[in-house]
Amino acid sequence: MAGHDVQYGKHRTRRSFSRIKEVLGLPNLIEIQTDSFKEFLDTGLKEVFEDVLPISNFTDTMELEFVGYELKEPKYTLEEARIHDASYSAPIFVTFRLINKETGEIKTQEVFFGDFPIMTEMGTFIINGGERIIVSQLVRSPGVYFNDKVDKNGKVGYGSTVIPNRGAWLELETDSKDIAYTRIDRTRKIPFTTLVRALGFSGDDEIVDIFGDSELVRNTIEKDIHKNPADSRTDEALKEIYERLRPGEPKTADSSRSLLVARFFDPRRYDLAAVGRYKLNKKLNIKTRLLGQTIAENLVDPETGEILVEAGTEMTRDVIDSIAEHLDGDLNKFVYTPNDYAVVTEPVVLQKFKVVAPNDPDRVVTIVGNANPDDKVRALTTADILAEMSYFLNLAEGIGKVDDIDHLGNRRIRAVGELLANQFRIGLARMERNVRERMSVQDNEALTPQQIINIRPVTAAVKEFFGSSQLSQFMDQHNPLSELSHKRRLSALGPGGLTRDRAGYEVRDVHYTHYGRMCPIETPEGPNIGLINNLSTYGRLNKYGFIQTPYRKVDRATGKVTNEVVWLTADEEDEYIVAQANSKLNEDGTFAEEIVMGRHQGVNQEYPSHLVDFVDVSPKQVVAVATACIPFLENDDSNRALMGANMQRQAVPLIDPKAPFVGTGMEYQAAHDSGAAVIAKHDGKVVYSDADKVEVRREDGSLDVYTIQKFRRSNSGTAYNQRTLVKVGDIVEKGDFIADGPSMEGGEMALGQNPIVAYMTWEGYNFEDAVIMSERLVKDDVYTSVHLEEFESETRDTKLGPEEITRELPNVSEEALKNLDEMGIIRIGAEVKEGDILVGKVTPKGEKDLSAEERLLHAIFGDKSREVRDTSLRVPHGGDGVVRDVKIFTRANGDELQSGVNMLVRVYIAQKRKIKVGDKMAGRHGNKGVVSRIVPVEDMPYLPDGTPVDIMLNPLGVPSRMNIGQVMELHLGMAARNLGIYIATPVFDGASSEDLWDTVREAGMDSDAKTILYDGRTGEPFDNRVSVGVMYMIKLHHMVDDKLHARSVGPYSLVTQQPLGGKAQFGGQRFGEMEVWALEAYGASNILQEILTYKSDDVNGRLKAYEAITKGKPIPKPGVPESFRVLVKELQSLGLDMRVLDEDDYEVELRDLDEGEDDDVMHVDDLEKARVQQAKEAAELEKAKEEALDKTE
C-alpha cells in the first residue's frame, strides 16, 4: 500500500502520500488579526496617548497628562449586538491628571472616552449588527531609498528619498551636469551643499572633509556660490531654503531655522516610527556598506592603539564579524561641531572610513555612517542627513546599491492594530487643539479634565474608520474558507496606499521575496490583480510589520539540517542560501546529494550542499490557505489554479455537505481556524448535548456552555447552520470540534460533494464547458442549499399622523390576509409567494382637512373612516419561500430605534434552492461551467455494474487549459471510493504518478483507469473507453434564481420616461443602438417602431395602446417619444429656437415636464388608473348583463 494513515481531529483518518516530515505545525491562521488587536489594546493605545499628551496651554501655566486607561465590560453580548443592529463595543475610561503649574494643584479624574469596538474571538468586529473585517494594508515602509535612472543620453543619474511615517520628504538627485541637488517636501531643488551649510558646516573645506573629495562634491560647490557677503554662508543658505519652502514671504534666517526644525527635527511633526528608524539605521550602517570594499587606512582601536585591520585589506564578512564590536563601538568616530548659526547646534557624531574606489584604484572614497542613533530617536538627526548624502555620493563611485521598492523588505503590513492606532491618533490630534483653546480661555481655578476634554473628535474618527474606510469591509461569509481568506487578505489599496489607476505592472507582479510570505497564486482577476494578495500559510508579522517565513537551520559545522526553526524577513533572507523542502536527506539529517536546488536573492539554481544555510519548513509554505486546498496543484497551470482558489471561496454551503475523498490535509486546519465551527475552550466531559447547546464539565468542576447557531442568516444570505458533533459522555480536549459549522463535515471543510463524473460528450449539451447533470442530484438534494433573506418594515411618525401595523388594510381581500396574525404580521412557517403581504401597514393620506363634525365622529367611532394608504411590506420578485423567523422591536420593549421610528419588524424568509439549469458549478482546478441539462437517471450513461454517472464534463475543457490535476483527482477519487478511504495529497508533496497507479490497481480498477460506459437510453456500450471517476464539485454563489428576471409593467425614469434597467429596479431589457441596426437591416419597421415608442418612452402612446389592447380595439398610431422632447429642450437650453412642425406645417405641442410625478421615478399610476377604470367598466357590463338576464327570465 502506498502512503500512510494520518489522523485529522477525532472524526477523520486520511491516507496521506506526503514524504516530507514537517517539523513545524501551521500557526493559528487568524493570528494576523487577533495578535495585532491584542497588541493594540496592550501597548498601542497607550503609545498613542503618550504621543499626543501632555498638552499645555499657550501660556504654559496648565498641563494635561495621561495616566492610564481601562476597558469596561461590553454593553451587549455578541448575539444581542447582532439582533439589535448595535456594535459589539466596550466603554473605555481614561484617567487624566490636570496640573496647574502656578498653584501646584493637581486634579486627577477618570473620563469616559466613548465606546470602542472590540474584536471577537474570530477576528471580526460587529458594527451596527453587521460582521466586518479590517483588511491588513501593504504599504511602502518608512526609511531611506536610493534609486538610479538613465537619462535620454544614456547617462546614469542617482536619486535618494527619506520617507517618514509622517512628515516632509527629503530628496537628493543628480542632473546631467553632475551636480547634486536636494528637494525638501517636493519643492524646487537647491544644491545639496546649501542644506549642509544650513546644518552648520559652511566652509567648502569642511564639506570636502566630511564627504571626501569627488567630482560630484566639487561641481556642486562650484554651483553654490556666496552671493551676499553681508550674510554668513549658513544664514544665506537658510534664507535660500526658506525662499523655496515659503515663496513670496519675507525671508529671515531665524524663521528658516524654526521652519527646518519643525519640518525634520521635531518629533511631534516628523515621525520615522520604530520601523523607519530601524530601516534607516540598517541602510546607513557602516557594516553593510564596508562589505566587499578594500580599506584604504589602518583601523586602530581607539582605546589600546592596536591595529585591528591593515590598509589594503578586503573587508569580507569574516573580517567585519571579527571587528563587529569595535564597529558598533567608537571605532573611527568623529565629533563635528556645527557653527552657531546652524539649525541644530548640538555636536554631530559620525563614523568615517576611507576605502579604495572600486572603479579607480588610485582614488580614496570616504564612507560616512550615522553612528546608529538609538531606536527611540524618531525624528531625523543631522548625522542621518549627512550619512544619507554620503551614501548617495558613494553610489556614483560604485559603492552601495540601489533599492527595489517591490522587495518585501521595503513593503510592510499595517495590520488592524496599527490602522486603529493611526485613526485614534488623528482623533486625539483634533481633540488636542480643542483642549488647548479651552485651557487658555476658561478660568484656571475651577477647571477639571472632564470640562476641557471633548471626546467627539475621537469617537467620530473611530466611527468613520469602521463605518466607511476602504479597509473596513463587510465580511465575505459565503463559507468558512472565504471568511478565513478575508481575514488573511493583504491590500495595497486604501488610504496611504496605491490606487488602481496608478499601479503599474511592477507592483502587481510576483516578486521573489513573496516566497513563503505572500501567495503567488491567490489574487483577484480584474483591475485589482496583484494589488490584493493573501498571506501564505506559514507567514506571520514581526514587530515592525514585515512578513516573516520559517526555515529549518542547517548546522554548517556538521552539515545537518536541524529541527531548529528560524523566522526570516525578506531582507534577512537575502544574505543566505535556502534549499527546497523536498531536498533528500539521509537518516542523520545530512543532505543526501552533493548538489541541491536552492535560492539566493531570487536566483533559483543548483548549489553545493555545504553552502546551504537554511531549508524550507514545508512545501506548502509558498501558497495561501485556499490554494493549499487544491490537490495536485503542481499539475495545474497557474492561471487555472488562481481561478480554482478564488472559486472555492464562492462555494455555497449545502444542506448535507461531504468532505472531499481526495483532499490535501489542509481541510481540517482551515475549518478549525475559520471561526465558523464551535471549538472547545478547555478540556472536559460532555454532560449535555442537543441541537441548540452543548455543556462541558471542566476538570475543575466549572461548566462551559456552548451555543449552537441554527439557520442564522450570514452576510451573504446563506444559512449559517452549525451541527453538534459530540454526545453526552464524550471526553473533549481543548481545541476539539464541538460542532461543525456551515460547509463542514466531521471537523473538515466540505464545500461540495463527491459525484461520479465522466469525461464525455453527450448530444452536444456540454459544449463550451457546460455541465450535464443527473436528476438524482436534484431529487436526493445533493446540491440543495438554503438561503435566508431579511426584509424589514418600520412605522414612522409622519406629518399627517403615525403609520400603523395592522390587519385592517384598505381594498385587500380576506384571502390575502389569511397568513397574518391579529397584529397584521405574517406567521412563522407560512409559505409565501411573490406579492404576498408580510407586514400589513397603513400610512395616513393627507387628502383634506377634517371638519369639526368629522373629527367628533372619528373620536366616537374610531379611525375606521380615516383616509389611509396601504404601504404593506410584500414579498419582492423572486423572494418566495417559508417564513423562518419574525423579530419585532418596539420602544416599549426597551429596544433602541432610530428617531422617528416607533416599531420595526424583521421577517426572515428561507428558500430551499435545488440545483437547476443555469446554476454555476466548478471543480477545484478552475474547471467551471454552467448546468445545461438535467437528464433523468435512466437516460444517463451507466457503469458495467449498473451505477449511473452523476455528471458529464466535456473532455475538450482539459488540454488547452492545462489543468491536468482534475484528471489525476478523478482517478484517485474513484480508487478512494472503491476502497472506502479518504486521501490526503498535500500540495507539492502529494501522490506521484506511481502512487496514483498503485492505488488504482489496489482498488481493482483497470490499468488505464478508464471503463466501458453503456448508453442509458439504448443499453448499447459507447464506442470508446471513458475516464470515469469521483471529482469534488462545488456549487457556486452565481445562481440563476438571482439572475432570472422578467418585466411586464414597471417603473419609468422621470426625465427620459424610458424603463429603468436592472433586476433590482425591476427594469426592462435595453434595446440599444446596435440592436436597432440589426432590425433596420431586416427592414422590420413596425417592430422597430413599437420598440422605440410604445415599449419605451412614448408616454401617451403607451397609455392608449394599453387601453386599446384591454378593450380589444386596434392600436392607435404612436406619438412623439419623450427622448425627442428631451433633445428639443436641450437644444432650446443652448439658445436655439426649436419647434416641431407636422406635415401641414402646424406646430406640434410637446408634453411639459412637470406633468409627471415629483419623484425620480414616474410610477405606473396612469396604467393603474386605466386598469381600475377598465375593471369598473367590466363590472358595469356584467351588472347590465345580469339585469338583462333577470328581465328575460
Curated annotation (Swiss-Prot):
SUPFAM superfamilies xref list: beta and beta-prime subunits of DNA dependent RNA-polymerase
Keyword Transcription: yes
Compositional bias of kind Basic and acidic residues: 1177-1193
Start and end residues of each stretch annotated as Disordered: 1173-1193
Catalytic reactions on record: RNA(n) + a ribonucleoside 5'-triphosphate = RNA(n+1) + diphosphate
Molecular function terms, GO-annotated: DNA binding; DNA-directed RNA polymerase activity; ribonucleoside binding
Keywords, in A-Z order: DNA-directed RNA polymerase, Nucleotidyltransferase, Transcription, Transferase
A Gene Ontology term for the protein's cellular component: DNA-directed RNA polymerase complex
Disulfide bonds: none
Enzyme Commission no: 2.7.7.6
Pfam families the record matches: RNA_pol_Rpb2_1, RNA_pol_Rpb2_2, RNA_pol_Rpb2_3, RNA_pol_Rpb2_45, RNA_pol_Rpb2_6, RNA_pol_Rpb2_7
Biological processes, Gene Ontology terms: DNA-templated transcription
PANTHER family registered for this protein in UniProt: DNA-DIRECTED RNA POLYMERASE I SUBUNIT 2
Function summary: DNA-dependent RNA polymerase catalyzes the transcription of DNA into RNA using the four ribonucleoside triphosphates as substrates.
Assigned protein family: Belongs to the RNA polymerase beta chain family.
Quaternary state and interactors: The RNAP catalytic core consists of 2 alpha, 1 beta, 1 beta' and 1 omega subunit. When a sigma factor is associated with the core the holoenzyme is formed, which can initiate transcription.
Record's protein name: DNA-directed RNA polymerase subunit beta
